[in-house]
Amino acid sequence: PSCDDESLVVALVRGAFEYQGQKCSAASRAYLPRSVFRRIEERLVAETKALTMGDVTDFTNFLGAVIDDRAFARHAGALAAAKADPRCKILVGGATDDREGYFVQPTIVLVDDPRHTLLSDELFGPILSVYVYEDEAIDETLTLLDETSPYALTGAIFSRDRAALSRIATRLRQAAGNLYLNDKPTGAVVGQQPFGGARGSGTNDKAGSKLNLLRW
């Protein structure tokens, strides 16, 4: 609950929607304490609504089209299912258009079932699923976060409390190959930073030279 709200909002928007969410390190799910969600919901929705989408040769656009018809069908199907699911609420976005290119609006879905497939499946697109937990349920939520998805490439923790950052990072050691503190999940600097995943996302074997040995 002690996080910097502005930094968190920027990280969620950029982490989820840069490159249309089509990068391996994109943020696809977020677990937010209820007190934090209440503080940032309006700003998060507004910032997402403000994102422009269109021709990538026009540098005023933040997003372009998703890569192909199969990706579009996967994203459109997931959004249609979310709209029909009483456990889900579309906070912003949700529209798709394939008349010219394969465009998927940046979308945030509020999910009230922590075992929902939106929190475990990898859509690889501009869809951010958010689960809001009660502030006092942090330990149970960390267990959920650690156990829900088979993928474990990147993650991020936001807090001004250094002790909390250290405790949570240790608890989630196997939940992400690259775990960022107070920064969005992103790519690595090849040859300078270890980058890789855990579990279904690999074993830190992609870049970073001898630094990869630090995991063991």
PLM regions: where:
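ALDH superfamily catalytic-core signature
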Residues: P1-P114, V132-D139, T143-E147, L181, ...
